[in-house]
């Protein structure tokens, strides 16, 4: 069972990294970042259960990561809509806000 969960987590992480590297759209990059965070959470919970099932350190840490992901999921689209209003595009290479 441990191997199956770790393989699924590795696939999710790999898909997220590939999508984050190759995506040119910010919405797609945010979704890939969520995939990466979910894969990390799966690893935390799996290793916490495998190594010491009496202590809940991995589970608690995954709850913190879920809270951070929820904040990112709430703030990210707001930032994206602001960038879209100003630049009329959500492409990553056109979103340099330092120069106008």
Curated annotation (Swiss-Prot):
Subcellular location field: Plastid, Chloroplast thylakoid membrane
Topology with respect to the bilayer: Multi-pass membrane protein
InterPro entries in the record: NADH_UbQ_OxRdtase_chain4L/K, NUOK/Mnh_C1-like
Its EC number(s): 7.1.1.-
Cellular component terms per the entry's GO annotation: chloroplast thylakoid membrane
Reaction(s) the record says it catalyses: a plastoquinone + NADH + (n+1) H(+)(in) = a plastoquinol + NAD(+) + n H(+)(out); a plastoquinone + NADPH + (n+1) H(+)(in) = a plastoquinol + NADP(+) + n H(+)(out)
Annotated TM spans: 1-21, 31-51, 60-80
Catalytic class of the enzyme: translocase
GO molecular function: oxidoreductase activity, acting on NAD(P)H, quinone or similar compound as acceptor; quinone binding
GO BP: any one term: photosynthesis, light reaction
Keyword line: Chloroplast, Membrane, NAD, NADP, Plastid, Plastoquinone, Quinone, Thylakoid, Translocase, Transmembrane, Transmembrane helix, Transport
Record-stated family: Belongs to the complex I subunit 4L family.
Functional note: NDH shuttles electrons from NAD(P)H:plastoquinone, via FMN and iron-sulfur (Fe-S) centers, to quinones in the photosynthetic chain and possibly in a chloroplast respiratory chain. The immediate electron acceptor for the enzyme in this species is believed to be plastoquinone. Couples the redox reaction to proton translocation, and thus conserves the redox energy in a proton gradient.
Subunit structure: NDH is composed of at least 16 different subunits, 5 of which are encoded in the nucleus.
Protein name in the entry: NAD(P)H-quinone oxidoreductase subunit 4L, chloroplastic
Organism of provenance: Cucumis sativus (Cucumber)
Gene, per the UniProt record: ndhE
């Amino acid at each position: 069972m441990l191997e199956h969960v770790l393989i699924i987590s590795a696939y999710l992480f790999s898909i997220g990294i590939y999508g984050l590297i190759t995506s040119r759209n910010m919405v797609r990059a945010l979704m890939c970042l969520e995939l990466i965070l979910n894969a990390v959470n799966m690893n935390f919970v799996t290793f916490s259960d495998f190594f010491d099932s009496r202590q809940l350190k991995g589970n608690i840490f995954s709850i913190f990561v879920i809270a951070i992901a929820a904040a990112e999921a709430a703030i990210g689209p707001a930032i994206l809509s602001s960038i879209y209003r100003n630049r009329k595009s959500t492409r990553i290479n056109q979103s340099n806000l330092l120069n106008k």
